[in-house]
Regions:
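An anionic, glycine-rich sequence signature occurring as long contiguous blocks
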Residues: 80-107, 111, 165-241
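Domain-level cores of phosphate- or acyl-group-handling catalytic modules
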Residues: 103-182
Length: 241
């Protein structure tokens, strides 16, 4: 382990070149016009002061706030298989303050690095995928960290569809045709829509589990995610319980 740490941290090697070769090989094996690019964050529990970007933040692995490092990852999936294709370390904003100056030097943090939110890091990676043209894809999927970010969604490539999780307290406008009347109504939370007795649910197979199919009730409702009435703000809201 120590030898690997020395190799990764002290020896000179072209990380960008290795990552580029990895993408080329994955693309050669997996790329497909109907491919899916998935965005997610993942954390590693970390203690001490000798590792960059360690902070008291949400750790998805533990489901609670803990000292950890957090990264944003990009995966590619097609009918041919799946693989991770890119990554960015998320550096919390406080790490750029004066009180962290010595720790930045000790951890050899690049001086030109600037703070970026996780959705920004994800957008950068997706834009790089499009720029290189190695991977064909039609879909982008993400969880609430990215689905709740209007900037992330607005900056996605125009040619892709997006399946994004959003928070249950997110407010949207129900499309008038699906309301009892066509008058402009106030926004409602996703959880309130899910509790509405008028919503029709259908039992569907969600996935294949180790002990058989995983079933759940699903529904969909046409909504506006922003200024109601504008066609560009219309979305399908998919519900599951």
């Amino acid at each position: 382990v120590r030898n690997l740490q020395r190799f990764m941290g002290e020896y000179k090697w072209d990380e960008d070149l290795i990552a580029s070769r990895h993408k080329e090989e994955v693309a050669r094996l997996l790329t497909d016009p109907e491919g899916v690019v998935s965005v997610d964050s993942s954390e590693v529990v970390k203690k001490g002061k000798d590792s960059v970007a360690v902070a008291h933040q949400y750790c998805g692995r533990l489901g609670k706030i803990e000292n950890c490092q957090s990264g944003v990852y990009l995966a590619y999936t097609s009918t041919k298989g799946y693989a991770l294709i890119d990554r960015r370390l998320f550096v919390p904003e406080k790490w750029f303050g004066q009180e962290y100056e010595e720790r930045r030097k000790k951890c050899k943090m690049p001086q030109d690095l600037v703070f970026k939110k996780k959705p920004e890091l994800a957008n950068e990676m997706i834009q790089e995928v499009c720029k290189r043209g190695l991977f064909s894809f039609r879909w982008v999927t993400c969880d609430t960290i990215f689905g709740n970010s209007p900037e992330f969604l607005q900056n996605l490539p125009e040619h892709v569809f997006c399946l994004a999780e959003i928070a249950k307290n997110r407010k949207v406008w129900i499309k008038p045709e699906e309301s009892r009347d066509r008058k402009k109504r106030p926004p409602v939370s996703v959880s309130d829509i899910a509790r509405d007795e008028k919503v029709a649910w259908k039992l569907s197979k969600l996935a294949e589990g180790a002990k058989g199919p995983i079933l759940g009730f699903v529904s969909r409702v046409r909504v506006y995610v922003d200024d109601p009435g504008k066609a560009e703000n219309e979305r399908w809201l998919f519900l599951r319980k």
